[in-house]
């Protein structure tokens, strides 16, 4: 491990914590793992239950300070917007969703390195969610009578980071960890004020982290309570003082 590269990474995270805690806070909860198997940088899962930031030293070495912080913001937003879980939960085509997720993020970040994909690449408006961009890509592929993979290959687009580590993991545990990280990051930014964070992005982050009621679980709990109450009542012997007697 190159100590200078690790120091650059930690310094960039420290600056984000100071000036943009929404992003910097995320990395306090992630393992930092140097890897030569990925060409750039990526958030992913380790041991199926822990989140990690993977980075290639050569990639970081070739970035300016502004570019490094921009890529870190990019990775933090994948966490804050639950993209790791969303692609599996919705059953999306992984490559198609990777491009859609990057379009949703990149239009809010300045100083990204060359090669980043933006909505304008597909003549789409900025400020939409990853799900919206994914549907738009699917619609365009159908219009061209191609499958999504073929259309993206013909366009020659790619992601600025590596999404290959969004593989197998315990979805319930990872979802809970992401929710806790996002809650901490949002609170940290609220203390400082949202500042120059784009309003549309703030709305997406808040919406992605609203508590969701598990109605299936709630209904099951309610039914169990009703059944339990019914059993309890049938076991109770009637009090003779309150037995209704019909006249006559």
Model-predicted segments: where are they?
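Negatively charged
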Residues: 107-248
């Amino acid at each position: 491990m190159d100590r200078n590269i690790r120091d650059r990474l930690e310094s960039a995270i420290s600056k984000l914590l100071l000036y943009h805690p929404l992003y910097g806070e995320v990395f306090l909860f992630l393992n930092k793992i140097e890897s030569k198997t990925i060409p750039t940088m990526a958030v992913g899962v380790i041991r199926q239950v822990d989140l990690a930031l993977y980075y290639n030293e050569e990639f970081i070495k070739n970035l300016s300070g502004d570019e490094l912080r921009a890529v870190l913001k990019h990775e933090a937003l994948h966490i804050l917007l639950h993209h790791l879980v969303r692609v599996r939960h919705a059953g999306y085509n992984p490559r198609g969703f990777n491009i859609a997720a990057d379009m949703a993020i990149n239009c809010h970040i300045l100083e990204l390195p060359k090669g980043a994909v933006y909505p304008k690449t597909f003549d789409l408006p900025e400020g939409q969610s990853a799900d919206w961009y994914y549907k738009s890509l699917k619609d365009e592929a159908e219009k061209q009578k191609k499958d999504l993979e073929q259309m993206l290959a013909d366009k020659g687009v790619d992601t600025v980071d590596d999404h290959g580590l969004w593989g197998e993991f315990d979805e319930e545990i990872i979802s809970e960890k992401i929710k806790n990280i996002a809650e901490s990051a949002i609170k940290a930014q609220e203390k400082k004020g949202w500042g120059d964070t784009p309003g549309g992005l703030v709305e997406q982050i808040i919406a992605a982290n609203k508590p969701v009621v598990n109605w299936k679980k709630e209904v099951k709990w309610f039914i169990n309570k009703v059944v339990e109450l019914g059993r309890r009542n049938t076991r109770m012997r009637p009090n003779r003082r309150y037995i209704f007697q019909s006249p006559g």
